């Protein structure tokens, strides 16, 4: 059994490079307002992709479509080889899609440990006690502060503590793709550095893919293997970080 309770078969399948997510001409609306316009991009297994753009261009809306919170009016979403365009949110989560939203969505009246358990219970496999201990130990290794506050209600935590909890909870679901919506926003610099180190570690392990919504090019440049840049609800630039210049990306980030 691998780290964080990943089965040997699952580990083997992730060693090979394949497309874990494919969006094909996704269109989404709020009421009659056309928000996403023919959004198309792919993410490979183990890849770190940064979704970038100014405020209001559709980045968070894209994540809502990915998680099923907002249905696409047209287009197709393939996840891990299956068409999940019409799949409900809980089915997507069980299939390995985990999200840390901008608001973190920590349940305020549950303790830190209870919040973490919600992530673990979302797993699609049937882990035993050894797997549970291994998975929790890894989260505590990544975010040791959590071990000191396990019995505190989530609502009394600082922003940085809540972000660590939210990421830890998502990791316990054993994701194939982790969505992070501006994980460093409003967080103290020391926690930002810690989150960056965690992402770099997962990038090196290539255990799962990460889609990172980020506005800061400096932070994104240290992590991204691919950029997907949006403007006015559409993808305007997409490519490997080795193929795009900073100026090609920056022109769509500055006002």
Regions found by a protein language model. Give the residues of each.
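The feature captures the beta-strand-to-loop junction immediately N-terminal to the Walker
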Residues: 52-54
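Helix-to-loop junction immediately C-terminal to a conserved catalytic motif
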Residues: 67
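Conserved ABC transporter NBD signature motif
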Residues: 75-83, 95, 131-136, 141, ...
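ABC ATPase C-loop
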Residues: 170-171
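Catalytic Walker B motif of ABC-type/P-loop ATPase nucleotide-binding domains
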Residues: 178-182
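Helical segment within the ABC ATPase nucleotide-binding domain
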Residues: 193-207
